[in-house]
Amino acid sequence: MKKDIHPDYHSITVQLVDGTTYQTRSTYGSAGDTLQLDIDPSVHPAWTGGKSHMLDAGGQVARFNKRFGGLTLGKK
């Protein structure tokens, strides 16, 4: 087996939207880094019945609506 071809696998902290944290091992970042999630199963519409609103990260939804808001799909 070749040496030094695999990424470093180390412990990181994952922080959920509600502030809950847990330790896991990953190739993300470097040892001891914290991965902060924008969306997780506790707030994702697929697991909450679709009642939650997706967070608009950086105005992407507004930019999409501005760009494509006037389009119609064959209806007059």
From Swiss-Prot:
Single GO biological process annotation from the record: translation
Q: Which InterPro entries match?
A: Ribosomal_bL28/bL31-like_sf, Ribosomal_bL31, Ribosomal_bL31_A, Ribosomal_bL31_sf
The keyword rRNA-binding belongs to this UniProt entry's keyword annotation: yes
Gene Ontology CC entries for this record: ribonucleoprotein complex; ribosome
Q: Which Pfam families match?
A: Ribosomal_L31
Q: Which molecular-function annotations from GO does this UniProt entry contain?
A: rRNA binding; structural constituent of ribosome
Q: Which UniProt keywords apply?
A: Ribonucleoprotein, Ribosomal protein, RNA-binding, rRNA-binding
Q: Give a yes or no for keyword NAD in this entry.
A: no
Q: Which residues are connected by disulfide bridges in this protein?
A: none
The record describes its quaternary structure and partners as: Part of the 50S ribosomal subunit.
UniProt lists the family membership as follows: Belongs to the bacterial ribosomal protein bL31 family. Type A subfamily.
Which NCBIfam families does the record cross-reference, listed alphabetically? L31 (TIGR00105), PRK00528.1 (NF001809)
Function description: Binds the 23S rRNA.
Task: Give the matching HAMAP family.
Answer: Ribosomal_bL31_1
Name of this protein: Large ribosomal subunit protein bL31
Q: Which organism is it from?
A: Rhizorhabdus wittichii (strain DSM 6014 / CCUG 31198 / JCM 15750 / NBRC 105917 / EY 4224 / RW1) (Sphingomonas wittichii)
| Record gene name | rpmE
